[in-house]
Amino acid sequence: MSAAPVVDAEYMAEVERARRDLRALIASKSCAPIMLRLAWHDAGTYDKATKTGGPNGSIRFPQEYSHAANAGIKIAIDLLEPMKQRHPKITYADLYQLAGVVAVEVTGGPTIDYVPGRRDSSDSPEEGRLPDAKKGAAHLREVFYRMGLSDKDIVALSGGHTLGKARPERSGFDGAWTKDPLKFDNSYFIELLKENSEGLLKLPTDKALVEDPTFRRYVELYAKDEDAFFRDYAESHKKLSELGFTPPRSAFIYKSCQKPKSLLMQTAAGVAVAAAVVAWAYLCESNKRLG
């Protein structure tokens, strides 16, 4: 594993430049779904017991992207390689997770808190750590609990299937989960609760979410309350993107010091208004006394 990057002002500025480039790339290539898939699949190999796998960029190596569950993922890796060359300071691990965050945001999803500083690794985990779409609730829990995630995380993250479609050459399944596979919303859950969503895909792992009573409670909540889904999804996505990763203190210090100019202006304006009100009140009181 390589050394952790130094997350200073220069690194954070590079991250913001990469974020802008990612927005342009995703818009021009309509590749949000596969960018989200890349971020998930790099992170979703984490094992909390052995502290191996996770969002470390190892998916860029053939021994990992050739896993059956990663069929087609090389497309995303290749799309991001020129960007890595433009922003060499940023680690692959950070770039892949940033791509997932941007993919959600530019398609209408929630803003996800992103903290950089991940190390790159060339140590790929053994095959079989990612979810198998042909299995059910017990399998989902086995996979996600191994990562250290919860039932709520399982359902919230499954809502990411609102983006994209399954392809036979990659998974053996064919079709989209929603009517607009390039829009991030809560329609995945709405369709799940319908007995017949004609022309839309429902994998065995999708059906497990409505068949299992604990999972179903979250499905029903997210189907009727998109704000609740967005809130929980953003929280779960952040957890997934930081599995096995301890954000460097320098990143938090930098973020806390970067108060937006608009906010500073609002604060200054607020102080000025408050001062004016106090002065006006003082003058009024003085006039009363003089009268």
Curated annotation (Swiss-Prot):
How does this protein sit in the membrane? Single-pass membrane protein
Enumerate the Pfam families for this protein: peroxidase
What Gene3D superfamilies does this protein's entry cite?
A: 1.10.520.10, Peroxidase, domain 2
Name the source's superkingdom.
Eukaryota
- What this chain does, per the record? Plays a key role in hydrogen peroxide removal.
Anything else the record notes? Binds one cation per subunit; probably K(+), but might also be Ca(2+).
Question: Which protein, by its recorded name, is this?
Answer: Probable L-ascorbate peroxidase 3
Organism this protein belongs to: Oryza sativa subsp. indica (Rice)
